[in-house]
Swiss-Prot record:
Superkingdom, natural source: Bacteria
Pfam families for the chain: MFS_1
InterPro entries: MFS, MFS_dom, MFS_Efflux_Transporters, MFS_trans_sf, Sugar_effux_transptr_put
Name of the featured protein: Probable sugar efflux transporter
Main location: membrane
Subcellular location: Cell inner membrane
GO molecular function: carbohydrate transmembrane transporter activity
Similarity field: Belongs to the major facilitator superfamily. SotB (TC 2.A.1.2) family.
Length: 399
């Protein structure tokens, strides 16, 4: 009995450590969102040019997820994770010392390489290490780590950057990763790869119209969100004329509202995923259209951020449920593809946002983001009527 409780405790500790790792990996992807103005200032560049760093990072992750998954498919998982963390930490140290913008971009590419492999193996590892009968909870812990990065990671990164300089944000993430690595080394057993590394399931997945439709929806809606979200910090300061501190508060509110979205989805997501996703996309569309009108009043912006945060969290979780429901037989490859496609959207949104800021005006980012959001809303209503699939159809309850 004692051994069993100890092993359950250790199993949960392993999963929690992975969730913390997920938090750290996601925090670093989005940390620059809150630091664009500061980084631009120190290199004498425009924020829109610095924003290209987000696009490069996201597209490296998107391009490398599948190739790296195949290259590392035979590697023992514990050793692979340790190697990833060493690359991740070393790249953050380079970010800290970056003596030019080019060096900063190179350091970010190193981090993106580690990120691409990490996300292609994490869900499968969480499932393997979960206590018996607790796979769903283990996956939801990883999702929580990811979600919390949006909630607290970005604002905390921004606060550190405001008070100690943006370089300290990257150093702090590197130190957090070092502590997590120490825990992983202590807790993880040897984990031989169980993944065949075969791409045989790819053509099968792409022959599933429901899944392909969800992938298309993902890239369009994520592009819409990141067109505006990537530049929210300079928008608040230059267009709304509010302080840097207010930008931090707004990022905290937007992220914190994600918790409400997560709770709502937890209660209703399995049975009503389709309806919830469509409502959330409609809400995102409204927020993007109202971004500029709301910018003349700080309270209006705060209220808008709450709805925006709820919407984007429901969309992110909903897309994952749809992918898992459409590919219960190939979750590894399907989720790796999902991560890649999500990152294509992040990169595209950041790119569109930077071009709008450079060639139109930063004030227009909400309106331009609303165009793909409207397309996503129409597409979601079409595909969910055609394929009303939910996770429950594939995963009967096990008591």
């Amino acid at each position: 009995m004692t051994t069993n409780t100890v092993s359950r405790k250790v199993a949960w500790l392993r999963v929690v450590t992975l969730a913390i790792a997920a938090f750290i990996f996601n925090t670093t992807e989005f940390a620059p969102v809150g630091l664009l103005s500061d980084i631009a200032g120190s290199f004498g560049m425009e924020t829109a040019q610095v924003g290209m760093m987000l696009t490069i990072y996201a597209w490296v992750v998107a391009l490398m997820s599948l190739p790296f998954m195949l290259l590392t498919s035979k590697m023992e998982r514990r050793r692979l994770l340790i190697g990833l963390f060493i690359l991740f930490i070393a790249s953050h140290v380079l970010s800290f010392f970056a003596w030019s913008f080019d060096v900063l971009v190179i350091s970010r590419i190193g981090i993106a390489f580690a990120h691409a492999v990490f996300w292609s193996i994490t869900s499968a590892l969480a499932i393997r290490m979960a206590p018996p009968g607790k796979r769903a909870q283990a996956l939801s812990l990883i999702a929580t780590g990811t979600a919390l990065a949006m909630v607290f990671g970005i604002p905390i990164g921004r606060i550190i950057g405001q008070y100690f300089g943006w370089r300290m944000t990257f150093l702090a993430i590197g130190l957090g990763a070092l502590a997590t690595l120490a825990c992983l080394v202590k807790l993880l057993p040897t984990l031989p790869s169980e993944h065949s590394g075969s791409l045989k399931s790819l053509p099968v997945l792409f022959r599933r119209p429901a899944l392909v439709s969800v992938y298309i929806l993902t890239v369009v809606v994520v592009t819409a969100h990141y067109t505006a979200y990537s530049y929210i910090e300079p928008f608040v300061q230059t267009v709304a004329g509010l302080s840097g501190n207010f930008a931090t508060v707004l990022l905290l509110i937007l992220g914190g509202a994600g918790i409400i979205g997560s709770i709502l989805f937890g209660k209703l997501g399995n049975q009503h995923a389709s309806g919830l996703i469509s409502i959330a996309i409609g809400l995102l569309l409204a927020c993007l259209l109202l971004l500029l009108p709301a910018s003349d009043n700080a309270h209006h912006l705060m209220l808008l951020s709450i709805f925006w945060g709820v919407a984007i969290m429901i969309i992110g979780l909903g897309m994952q449920v749809k992918v898992l429901a459409s590919a219960p037989d190939a979750t590894d490859v399907a989720m790796s593809l999902f991560s890649g496609i999500f990152n294509i959207g992040i990169g595209a949104g950041a790119l569109v946002g930077s071009q709008v800021s450079l060639h139109l005006s930063m004030a227009s980012i909400g309106y331009i983001g609303a165009i793909p959001a409207l397309a996503a809303l129409v597409w979601s209503l079409m595909i969910f009527r055609r394929w009303p699939v939910s996770l429950e159809d594939h995963q009967p309850h096990h008591s």
